[in-house]
Amino acid sequence: MAGSERSGFSNSSDHLLENAYYILTPGGQVSLNKLTAFSELVDSLGAIPMVLTAEEHDFITAGVSHLPHIIASSLVNLVSALDNDAEYMKTIAAGGFRDITRIASSSPVMWQQICLENTKNISTVLDEYIRMLIQIRCSVDNKDADQLYQLFAASRDYRDSIDVTSSGLSPKLCSLS
């Protein structure tokens, strides 16, 4: 899993695959020898090969890649729609907004195609996210301090369990420099 919100050759990086997970989804006809050879090739590029079924890949990426892009894009569009003529929201948007919406600058064509290809999994994850948002809204409306605290504490704890000492969320296993 590698990339950025920018596309095209001018935005390429020779370290793009360094310590990135490279998901392999071999079909039933792929021999163990071919899978091993390809895994070794991926490893030689500095990436971390991970073998998943196509179904696992599609569900996992719906949650950790596709939904975040949908959230970022919809948040940008929400703020754009709610902002006034003086564009105060746009003007004061700072680190938090910029961090969560950076990926909204990605290629609309690419993300349109991803959403059209992984519809079932995206819809499943999106339904669960909407369910969680409804619960959060109830907690806010009811001024449920305990539920709100649990929301932020649980998300902080899970997020803090992700190794972010290297670029991206992947742990730095080696240096290719």
Feature-to-residue mapping (PLM):
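Rossmann-like NAD(P)(H) cofactor-binding subdomain of soluble oxidoreductases
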Residues: 1-10
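Short, flexible, solvent-exposed loop/turn segments with mixed acidic/basic and small polar residues
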Residues: 11-16, 113, 165-168
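Interdomain hinge/lid region at the active-site interface
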Residues: 86-154
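Charged/polar positions within long, soluble alpha-helices
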Residues: 72, 76, 138-141, 160-167
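Hydrophobic, well-ordered beta-alpha structural blocks that scaffold small-molecule cofactor pockets
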Residues: 144, 151-163, 172
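A conserved regulatory-domain signal marking ACT and ACT-like small-molecule sensing domains
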Residues: 165-177
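Alpha-helix N-cap/loop-to-helix initiation residues
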Residues: 2, 30-31, 122
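Internal alpha-helical scaffold of NAD(P)-dependent oxidoreductase catalytic cores
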Residues: 16-103
